[in-house]
């Protein structure tokens, strides 16, 4: 009787203090299960987001001077000529300047667009898991998304290193600069739909998805099998939408050239 009473009143061991941002970054790479449990217990957003943004702008600073914007404008001019052969050289030159200017501005705003994407991802994931009986808060979901994004940070660092080594990069071929997905096996102009589809099966994207599954299971208190079903279903929907847009663009280009 006394042993039972002693056991019921035994003090619980205190939880370890939460890891800092850099410990968590290392943890999601080498010990994701325990790290995402720590993130779910005490999520953080500001420091990892700022760190990713700083790295993103360093990459942008190094990449922008190496972007071959002429290749982008030439491709657009080719499409415009096919649709409007009567356009003058002055008009085409104006389109070329606008295209290059827009590309440069968009490139500098790219890291900031990432914030919007992370917020959308966190909101969609939280809604999906709550609808399927899971738990969690928006802060937990956003923190999970940010730390799951680390493989993509590594990817952009690798892309930047390759770009610096090459000297010039065609922005329209960014997804195949690093041969981490099978899209490089097909020609983007001849098979745009297949190119778009294959580009989704990137090693770094799959790595991110695995981390998302582990992290979402931790904050939502669901099984990893259920988390995998939800995350992969949402990913499949995104692939379908992206492929549909590629198909519409390809059909539009086909109409222009016929």
Question: Model features per residue range: what roles?
Answer:
Residues 21, 34-156:
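Selected alpha-helical membrane-embedding segments in polytopic membrane proteins
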Residues 30, 122-126, 209-211:
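A generic alpha-helix surface/boundary motif
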Residues 139-255:
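Hydrophobic alpha-helical transmembrane segments and adjacent short intramembrane/lumenal linkers
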Residues 11-16, 102-106, 191-195:
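Short juxtamembrane and helix-loop transition motifs at transmembrane-helix boundaries
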Residues 1-19:
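Low-complexity, intrinsically disordered extramembrane tails and loops of integral membrane proteins
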Residues 16-27, 96, 192-193:
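Coil-to-alpha-helix initiation sites in intrinsically disordered, low-complexity, charged segments
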